[in-house]
Amino acid sequence: MLSQRSQRNTSEIIPRLLREYHQPQAGNIDILDLSQAENSVLRDETLDEIRSAIGKHLNGSNLSYPTGVGGELAARKSLAMFFNDRFNPARSVSPDHIVMTPGASEALETLIFHICDPGEGVLIAAPYWSGLDLALETRSLARIVQVNIPLHEFFEMSSIQYYERALATSPIPIKAILMCNPHNPLGQCYNADVLEGLLGFCQRNKLHYISDEVYGMSVFSDSDKGVTPAFTSILSHATAPGLTSWVHMVYSLSKDFGCSGLRLGAIVTQGNTDLLLGSALITNNKVSSLTSVIVPSLLEPRTTQKLLNQNLRSRLNLNYGKVQRFLENRGLEFVPAKAGLFVFACLGKTRTEKEQLLLIECMKRSGVKLVAGTSFHFEQFCWFRIMFSLPKNIVDVALQRIGDALDETEKLL
């Protein structure tokens, strides 16, 4: 007999995941899978940097267990330098503020384990990435309390009233809010005023503020205005007395650097020693020594300038422009993206569940796979996340297949 924790996972969560993500191949067509938010536009350059780092720095000591509380010191120093250079913290980040984890999901799970007792809640605005359900609920047994915010208010000061309402009406105790900035799947950033308002909400209600900033450097120029919209890290705002012990940032190399398989995430918290030490304890030796060897080279300022400033932003902007024109030419509603690897768009006309199921079936026949907004806990039908962080020729093929699916759906309705 399995434990009660495991029984819930096998009876509820695993069947749901199989229903949502299983999609067989359509005939002889290789399906273009745009359901995973992976960054492929830097793959070649990142691979070159990793090969170079291993060739220069790998030695026999790296085959031993990792050393250091919270991860290898050299890697944590590089992360601290990167955050100080790129995230504009109000207080300088030191290696002692960082715990390394095998990915951002593990970082979130670790934070929730220390913040929430089983059955306690975390406020998250919908739509949100469904992987958070796994990170927060499967092991820590916390509960997500969904905050439904209209899209036109999602990044506005008026959004705070929805958090207040969710807190007031929650049937379970709330211990934290979790923000994704830049946002997945909406592809926008929160401005400084909204961040300050949300911090004030947390301070008034004694809630932890967790900021998932894994897309922090995947900010690209606005196609219409030719400017780079600002990403504001929560590290630049947690300045009120006593607030730093309640504010925690999560980062990972996976999205910005296009290396999800390396499994390197980080918890950054600057005023909560107990949480840091507890996190270091349960993540001890979980990050590979090989990954730790790579990090200092990958985060070296010369490398980040080339990868992020010169290559990533221009390539994401180019591909976003392709998707934007495709949607505009078809008269489809979408959330204009400024950051991230995707666009959130409504591909339906009638916006019914029947049409959404038909769209999914037609896309399968056309050889393309998207994730529906309902999988992100969005209440409206026919919204999909279109991932565009692929080689530009593949983006062209994907858009052609999506267009074919839309045409077929319209004929069948």
Curated annotation (Swiss-Prot):
GO molecular function, one term: pyridoxal phosphate binding
InterPro entries referenced in this protein's UniProt entry, alphabetically: Aminotransferase_I/II_large, Ethylene_sulfur-biosynth, PyrdxlP-dep_Trfase, PyrdxlP-dep_Trfase_major, PyrdxlP-dep_Trfase_small
Taxonomy, superkingdom: Eukaryota
Record-listed N6-(pyridoxal phosphate)lysine modification sites: K255
EC number, UniProt record: 2.6.1.-
Cofactor requirements of the protein: pyridoxal 5'-phosphate
Record's note on what induces expression: Expression is co-regulated with the other genes from the sirodesmin cluster and corresponds with sirodesmin production.
Keywords for the protein's UniProt record, in alphabetical order: Aminotransferase, Pyridoxal phosphate, Transferase, Virulence
Any single GO BP term: biosynthetic process
Pathway(s) of this molecule: Mycotoxin biosynthesis
Cleavable signal peptide: none
Pfam families, per the entry: Aminotran_1_2 (PF00155)
Family of the protein in this entry: Belongs to the class-I pyridoxal-phosphate-dependent aminotransferase family.
Function: Probable aminotransferase; part of the gene cluster that mediates the biosynthesis of sirodesmin PL, an epipolythiodioxopiperazine (ETP) characterized by a disulfide bridged cyclic dipeptide and that acts as a phytotoxin which is involved in the blackleg didease of canola. SirD catalyzes the O-prenylation of L-tyrosine (L-Tyr) in the presence of dimethylallyl diphosphate (DMAPP) to yield 4-O-dimethylallyl-L-Tyr, and therefore represents probably the first pathway-specific enzyme in the biosynthesis of sirodesmin PL.
Protein name in UniProt: Probable aminotransferase sirI
Native source species: Leptosphaeria maculans (Blackleg fungus)
Lineage summary: Eukaryota, Fungi, Dikarya, Ascomycota, Pezizomycotina
